[in-house]
């Protein structure tokens, strides 16, 4: 609950004091730092990475992104982009921590973090031009390199450190909590950037913001609900977190870099909804069903 309070405070600060918007370029490096601390002591298990349930998660991400973008496009192309980018967001680095609190299989969810983040980093710059064939988005090597670097560089560095400097890894593990505060700083910058855009540049009606919030709420309910349903009694918690708790900060960076801050409102609203749901799960307590 305390972490949820920090989250809402960071969002409120970005709305009330948006002057930090000019530093939004730091979000890229903050994401890399968050992933670095999250993956610091990760032991890659090929069996977990090849779990067929991860294939189901990837298939559902694509299916939900494609379907919701298609439906939203009936209303506007802007809403279609919001739906697609939000739905294709990968599993959040915080999902394994949440799964541990809920007494689930942490190894599976951590594998989902690695696999889905790599997948989204590869897929988004390739698919976005098909969804939005405008001037700001294009299939080029630089866009692909930018997204892949954010995910793969922290993974490569942490795995190399485990192999060649294990003592340094052991010394850094107690500081993993720093990643949370880096996340809060990134959320503030993203909110400030979106707020400044709405106040100074956007010509869209306020009704669009309500529609974006509704799409994010619907996607959040669909992802968590579908994940739990697909996982059944045995894997519902793990698949629910893998599909539902998303690395929306990565999607926000994609929006700010390749699209517009208005599109970034989709994953920003999703952050609020997924944290409200996870706060409910924590208050409810670990699952009582047998595993």
Regions found by a protein language model. Give the residues of each.
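Alpha-helical transmembrane segments of multi-pass small-molecule/ion transporters
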Residues: 1-291
């Amino acid at each position: 609950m305390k972490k949820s309070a920090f989250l809402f405070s960071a969002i409120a600060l970005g709305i009330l004091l948006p002057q930090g918007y000019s530093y939004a370029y730091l979000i890229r490096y903050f994401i890399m730092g968050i992933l670095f601390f999250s993956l610091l002591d990760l032991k890659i298990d090929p069996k977990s990475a090849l779990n067929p349930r991860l294939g189901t998660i990837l298939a559902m991400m694509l299916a939900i992104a494609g379907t919701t973008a298609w439906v939203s496009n009936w209303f506007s192309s802007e809403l279609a982009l919001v739906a697609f980018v939000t739905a294709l967001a990968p599993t959040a680095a915080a999902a394994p921590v949440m799964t541990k609190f809920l007494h689930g299989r942490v190894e599976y969810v951590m594998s989902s973090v690695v696999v889905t983040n790599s997948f989204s980093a590869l897929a988004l710059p390739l698919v976005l031009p098909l969804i939005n064939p405008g001037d700001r988005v294009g299939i080029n090597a630089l866009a692909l390199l930018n997204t892949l670097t954010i995910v793969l560089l922290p993974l490569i560095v942490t795995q190399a450190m485990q192999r060649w400097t294990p003592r340094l890894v052991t010394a850094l593990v107690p500081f993993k909590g720093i990643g949370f505060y880096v996340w809060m700083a990134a959320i503030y910058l993203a909110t400030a950037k979106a707020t400044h855009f709405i106040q100074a540049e956007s010509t869209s009606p306020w009704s669009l913001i309500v529609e974006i919030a509704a799409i994010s709420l619907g996607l959040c309910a669909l992802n968590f609900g579908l994940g739990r349903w697909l996982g059944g009694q045995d894997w519902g918690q793990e698949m629910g977190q893998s599909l539902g708790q998303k690395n929306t900060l990565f999607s926000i960076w994609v929006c700010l870099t390749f699209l517009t801050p208005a599109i970034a409102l989709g994953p920003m609203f999703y952050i609020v909804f997924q944290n409200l749901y996870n706060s409910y799960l924590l208050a409810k307590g670990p699952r009582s069903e047998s595993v």
